[in-house]
Amino acid sequence: MERALLIIDGTVLVLRPWFAKVSAPWAVARNQLRKEAAKYTHVAVVIDRTMDTFRRKLDPRYKAHRPPASAELIAHFNRFEEEVTKMGIALFGSLEVEADDLAATLTRHAVAAGLPVLIQAPDKDLFQLIRDAAPSVRVIAPKKGWDINEAGVMERLGVTPSQVTDFQALVGDATDGVIGVAGVGAKTAAALLTARGTLDAIYADLDGLVTLPIRGAKTLPRKLLAGKDDAMLARRLVTLRADVDMGADPLAKCEMP
């Protein structure tokens, strides 16, 4: 077994076979979990229990376009949770935060304990947690062929992990209903952050942006000023919480038998 903490997004694990119209999504998810869990000394499953988290309170538009889960799907989630518990694998869920926040908090505990982390979830929001320095943190998604380190973040987004939240604040995230700055796309956002480093530094000198070798640079001060409130709110929405109360020594709960 590899000495590392594997964090699996259980919600995604159930949803994938559900959307594939498999007859028993919970069973497919359980079997996949069993296979992956056998490889690591520490394993945790994190799940979303509600969409009405603190982010929805910050912005009612957050994930507002997503329909509520059907009774049948909820039954599959419940059965999967029962199976996880039977397997003796740590399961974490919350009515206040999302699975990604639980993953971020577990990652903080693991890094502090010198334990490498692998987060299995096809979610760019998690890129902000990635680090190459020991103990490393990587985001993996076998179905997508992901095994992403710092270079992988740069390759995909054009920024470093520490810049991911500022990048998302600029471009937004239609998947989650996060509104960024209108007229600022991924390439422009990456170029701005490469030149200025942070979102705050960009806004500290809007007039100076016109001299940057970026296509449409002369229009950037106007666009960024108009979208400032959206960008600042977006940054709050996409920043993962790593301070969730998960009880005493949550890492100990993740130790595999």
Predicted regions, residues:
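Short phosphate-engaging motifs
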Residues: 99, 125-126, 188, 198
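Noncatalytic, basic helical substrate-engagement surface that gates or grips nucleic-acid strands
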Residues: 2-116, 120, 126-145, 231-233, ...
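Non-catalytic nucleic-acid-binding/docking modules located in mid-to-C-terminal regions
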Residues: 2, 36-40, 44, 133, ...
